[in-house]
Amino acid sequence: MLPVEEQLRVITSGTMQIVPLDGLKEKLKKDTPLNIKLGVDPTSPDLHLGHAVPLRKMRQFQDLGHNVTLIIGSGTALIGDPSGRDSTRPPLTAEQVDANAETYVNQAMKILDPERTTVVHNGDWIKPMNLETMLGLMSKFTIARILEREDFSNRYHNQQPIALHEFIYPVLQAYDSVVIKADVEMGGNDQIFNLLAGRDLMRDMDMEPQIALTMPLLVGTDGTKKMSKSYGNYIGLTDEPNDMFGKVMSITDEIIPMYYRLCSTLSIDELDAIDRSFEDGTADPYQLKRALGRNIVDLYHGEGEGLKAQAAFDAQFKNNEVPDDVKEFTISLEADEDGLIYLPKILVEVEIASSNGEARRLIDGGGIKINQQPLPAKTYKVEPAVLEKALLQAGKKRWAQLI
């Protein structure tokens, strides 16, 4: 294995917190493979680059010679992770968990090394748990400690309901670490309480406590909100190569270094060089996005696919060409009492926007074109004739043909 300091340089790159860092150093000094834990409740069958951030870090651990345990929350998903929530999360059924987990693991293995990955389901030890064991675990935690969590504290002080079963979630996640004897547990920066609970429980059970390592939440392509399907700012791991490349090209310049560090396969030295280029003003954002797009497409679709996607992008957008596969829609163009059509509703119907709110934001930002002509900002209503057999476009990747 590499010297401890060289391993730490890789491990700490892009992380938010490592608690405690000295403890991680001591574990690495043993010069034996560590067991790196990531627990996931597969609430959705499809992953995006935001989900891939901790998986990429786990792959770095694997490349350093360590092992990974991926815990599928077949037990905890029946409760629903309350982290970062202002209301009770609807629990998943066992059938939903199983179906989503299969797709999740298949996509995760595009990133992880299967030879160094163990996949387990925490339902295997949670579901058979008897009352005596459950009460013993719950006695290790106090309500006062649980209410230290920001999300629970906010809900409590705002008099929003907190179901009793939600208190159990961090207890069971902590118990997962005991069962698999985790050396390091990873999660998003909204998971720090749960990760530290695992440390405490392991210590109470006379085990060497795990290290808590958190990763930042990836900002979406809009450069403001976290990446999420609900915000329409995501890059899916199963997106077609051309779509994936086009979405990378649409990210805002200021988040390019973050995307390189959290989503690419570049070395630490290469990442540091990109950071310096932004600091000293020598960066070429356009070329950096092209290289990033190639790298990400190659990672998820195979070597050489990035260049093909770049060529398709150049042919389409440099020459202002309309894609060959624009989806066609037949919709009703019913005017209101003023003889006008509310455009945001149409944009949702043709799948250019996921909601009226997103459609209005696209219009406000000047991001909509009709027949390849920019729509003036704040233009929410248009005459029916404007939309007859119109070609609608949002940015560089969303198109719709009305017929």
Give the residues covered by each predicted segment.
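Beta-lactamase-like hydrolase cores
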Residues: 1-28
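Divalent-metal (Mg2+/Mn2+/Ca2+)-assisted nucleotide/phosphate chemistry catalytic cores
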Residues: 15, 91-94, 98-214, 223
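N-terminal catalytic cores of NTP/NDP-binding nucleotidyl/phosphoryl-transfer enzymes
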Residues: 18-82, 184-192, 198
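Short, hydrophobic/aliphatic alpha-helical segments
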Residues: 31-39, 61, 68, 169-179, ...
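Well-ordered mid-protein domain cores that form the structural environment of catalytic cofactors
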Residues: 59-112
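Conserved beta-strand termini and adjacent loop/short-helix elements that scaffold enzyme active sites
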Residues: 71-73, 120-122, 215, 331
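Conserved nucleotide- and phosphate/pyrophosphate-binding catalytic cores
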Residues: 202-403
